[in-house]
């Protein structure tokens, strides 16, 4: 199973930057999206049911948005978790095969912000997660740590039920100094606070694996860059997007990579391949 995760920083905005063409061509079986900043009622037909494969380009060039035309066009199934607050947060999962079931975290504190979408395919549970930003001066640090606790609990429950949990998304934390360009000057900044990093360590100690580091120990491997100061051009970034699995299923991971050449957001996609 080929799975991609991407914080698109607004799905309607990235649609205007070629997102649907990218999605059609990316070859993924499942695509996890974070920071949709929209609810399904605000989206085009092609964002609700994105075409792929033969006839996809024709459907995407159709001025009506693809509604009702090209019925033989293959389309992704979609599941959205939207925030109650308009234009904020939100997650989604696209899949070529309809999931057996779709659910949220089951905690209104976080479901009201659309933080998690879970899709089950047999005994694989794919999770698209948008971890909270702790914000300046740690204004939402307590909220984030409560979210972290809740998602770990959910993952543990799924693992205990025999699911291979594949947790992807924007974790909003750079775990170690190798995971950001300027660690020394960011020690008091959101995304690199000691409490956030300590939680990630405890998450790994609880039996989960940062799959990218399973294959790649090199520095300067980032997934997010500020829009300011030509940061991406200079590769002054942070690695805050991850694919994690439980160590029980670590041997199922074939590869875990960063798709740094894909643009359209301040994040780039990340990809994992797992044996089914």
Spans of model-derived segments:
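Active-site-proximal beta-strand elements of phosphoester/diester hydrolases
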Residues: 1-9, 123-135, 168
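Surface-exposed cleft-lining segments at the edges of enzyme active sites
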Residues: 107, 131-148, 185-188
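Conserved beta strand-loop-helix elements of the APE1-like EEP
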Residues: 86-102, 219, 231-251
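Structured beta-strand-rich core segments of catalytic domains in phosphoester-bond hydrolases
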Residues: 37, 44-134
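Metal-dependent phosphoesterases centered on the DNase I-like endonuclease/exonuclease/phosphatase
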Residues: 30, 51-52, 58, 68-69, ...
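Active-site beta-strand/loop signature of hydrolases that rely on acidic residues for catalysis
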Residues: 7, 23-41, 126, 155-177, ...
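Active-site beta-strand termini and strand-to-loop segments that position acidic
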Residues: 96, 119-122, 246-247, 272-276
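Short, acidic/polar
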Residues: 12-24
């Amino acid at each position: 199973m080929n799975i991609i995760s991407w914080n698109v920083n607004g799905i309607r905005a990235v649609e205007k930057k070629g997102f649907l063409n990218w999605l059609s061509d990316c070859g993924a079986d499942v695509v996890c999206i974070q920071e949709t900043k929209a609810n399904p009622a605000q989206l085009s037909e092609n964002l609700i049911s994105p075409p792929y494969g033969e006839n996809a380009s024709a459907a995407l060039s159709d001025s009506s948005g693809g509604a009702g035309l090209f019925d033989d066009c293959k389309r992704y199934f979609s599941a959205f978790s939207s925030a109650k607050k308009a234009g904020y947060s939100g997650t989604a999962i696209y899949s070529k095969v309809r999931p057996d079931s779709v659910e949220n975290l089951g905690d209104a504190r976080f479901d009201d912000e659309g933080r998690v979408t879970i899709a089950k395919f047999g005994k694989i549970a794919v999770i698209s997660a948008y971890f909270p930003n702790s914000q300046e001066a740690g204004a939402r640090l307590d909220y984030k740590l409560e979210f972290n606790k809740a998602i770990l609990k959910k993952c543990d429950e799924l693992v205990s039920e025999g699911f291979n949990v594949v947790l992807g998304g924007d974790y909003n934390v750079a775990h170690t100094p190798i995971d950001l360009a300027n660690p020394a000057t960011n020690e008091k900044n959101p995304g690199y606070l000691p409490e956030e990093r300590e939680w990630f360590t405890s998450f790994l100690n609880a039996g989960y694996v940062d799959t990218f580091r399973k294959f790649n120990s090199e520095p300067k491997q980032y997934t997010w860059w500020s829009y300011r100061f030509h940061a991406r051009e200079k590769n002054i970034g942070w690695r805050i997007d991850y694919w994690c699995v439980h160590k029980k299923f670590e041997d199922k991971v074939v590869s875990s990579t960063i798709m740094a050449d894909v643009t359209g957001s301040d994040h780039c996609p990340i990809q994992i391949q797992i044996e089914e």
